[in-house]
C-alpha cells in the first residue's frame, strides 16, 4: 500500500550567540529552503506510474464475446454454466495481469493449450492458446507475454478464454478486470493532479 505525504517546508535558521543582537528578518531569511534532492512531486509521479504499471489487461484490447455465467452451449445448444470469460482475439500475445508465478502449463481436450498463473490468493488460467510462452515456475511481471491466442481444445474459433479462482473457488474474471480499470483510472487522475 502506497501513501503519499507532503514534505514539510524547511526554513533557514541562524543560531545566536549570547549577547548578540537579534537581526531583523529579511524576505530571503523567511523564504523556504530550496530543495536540493529529488522533488516530492517527482517522487509522487514515480509512485503513481509504478502503481499504474503494476496491473495489465490480458490483451491489448478487451472485447468480451461470451460473459461469465449461464449461456447456451455452442456445441450442445443447451443451457450450461460458462466458468470464464471469452475475449475476442486473433494471434495476439496474452499478457500477465499482475506479478505472479506460472503454476501450471498443459493441454487437454477442453481447454486446449493453457497456462495458469498465481497472483497471491488468485489463480488465472488462459486457455485455447496456440502457443504457451512461459514455463512452469517462471516469475512474471504485469505485461509479460505468457502465450499466444489460438483455438485449441473445445473451441468454436480463435479467442481467449480466461478463468479465475480466489482461494480455489471459481469467480467471475471481471472482478480482476474491474480492479485493473479502477486502479488505472485512479493513477491517471492522481497524475493529472500533479501536472
Where are these regions (language model features)?
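Surface-exposed, glycine-biased beta-strand/turn segments
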Residues: 10-113, 142, 194-195
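Short, surface-exposed secondary-structure boundary micro-motifs
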Residues: 107, 145, 150-151
Amino acid at each position: 500500500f502506497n501513501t503519499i505525504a507532503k514534505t514539510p517546508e524547511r526554513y533557514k535558521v541562524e543560531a545566536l550567540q549570547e549577547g548578540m543582537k537579534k537581526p531583523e528578518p529579511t524576505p530571503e531569511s523567511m523564504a523556504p529552503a530550496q530543495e536540493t534532492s529529488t522533488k516530492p512531486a517527482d517522487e509522487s509521479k514515480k509512485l503513481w506510474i509504478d502503481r499504474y504499471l503494476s496491473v495489465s489487461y490480458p490483451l491489448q484490447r478487451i472485447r468480451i464475446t461470451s460473459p461469465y455465467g449461464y449461456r447456451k452451449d455452442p456445441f450442445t445448444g443447451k443451457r450450461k454454466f460458462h466458468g470464464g470469460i471469452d475475449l475476442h482475439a486473433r494471434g495476439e500475445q496474452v499478457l500477465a495481469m499482475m506479478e505472479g508465478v506460472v503454476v501450471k502449463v498443459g493441454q487437454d481436450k477442453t481447454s486446449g493449450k493453457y497456462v495458469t498463473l498465481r497472483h497471491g490468493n488468485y489463480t488465472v488460467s488462459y486457455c485455447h492458446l496456440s502457443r504457451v510462452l512461459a514455463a512452469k515456475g517462471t516469475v512474471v511481471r504485469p505485461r509479460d507475454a505468457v502465450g499466444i491466442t489460438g483455438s485449441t481444445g473445445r473451441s468454436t474459433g480463435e479467442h481467449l478464454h480466461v478463468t479465475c479462482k480466489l482461494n480455489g473457488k471459481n469467480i467471475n474474471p471481471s472482478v480482476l478486470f474491474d480492479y485493473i480499470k479502477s486502479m488505472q483510472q485512479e493513477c491517471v487522475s492522481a497524475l493529472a493532479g500533479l501536472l
